[in-house]
Amino acid sequence: MFYCCGITNKGNRDHNEDALMIHKAYITEGTLEEHIPSPFIAAVADGVAGEQAGELASSLCLRLLSNIKYNHTTDLKERINDVHEVLVQYGLENGAYLNMQTTLCGVAIDENDRITTFNVGDSRLYRYRNAMLRQLSRDQSLVQLLYEKGTITNEEKRTHAQKNIIFPVLGNIHNAPQIDIHSYGEKMQYGDVLLICSDGLSDYVSSTEIEEILSLPRSMAKRLKMMSDLSLEKGSKDNISIIAISYYDDK
């Protein structure tokens, strides 16, 4: 069995363009907790600011994703590309929503409890294991490219003037998104936590700070709220969404 806890809030903005999904349930505000067996999918979507109807793009994306009947034979890249095409078509048919876009980041756990991750954009997926946090996703952003070329340091990524420039994401009518899929072929270990978040958290709260909060003897819901509160204290001007997933033996 898996315990999943997610929180999403508008932060310092007047509306929330984020959404999160755990299995068949998705929300655009508040807290969601589930105790569920595999298979299931969990994901965060962050509607792109400055484009039409980011909040519709993220919520529609997750509504479509929640309809996928996932197992180890599912072609996730194809299914996510189907979501992209629906968003594009919706915008073409409804002019007010033309070019609405969203990031998408998450994990699919099959009926054998094996993990596959997926990512489009700059939302993030981490794994917390043995008191250490490791980023499993790769940011599809200009600053990540500059970092990989050695132009800027990892620390400079968070404060760079062009940190908000990302590569094409779901719903982009001009360029197809790059859908990153990685199958790990391994199961979660006891004590592991998979953490999915929008950049409203990761742009302001460091990996070390996330590690410190996850190590605390508090409920997961309280720890996620602590992360969200810390992000706001450090000046986050974005929506904030976080999902944590852990494994336990129910026998």
Residue spans for each PLM region:
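PP2C/PPM-type serine/threonine phosphatase catalytic domain
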Residues: M1-K251
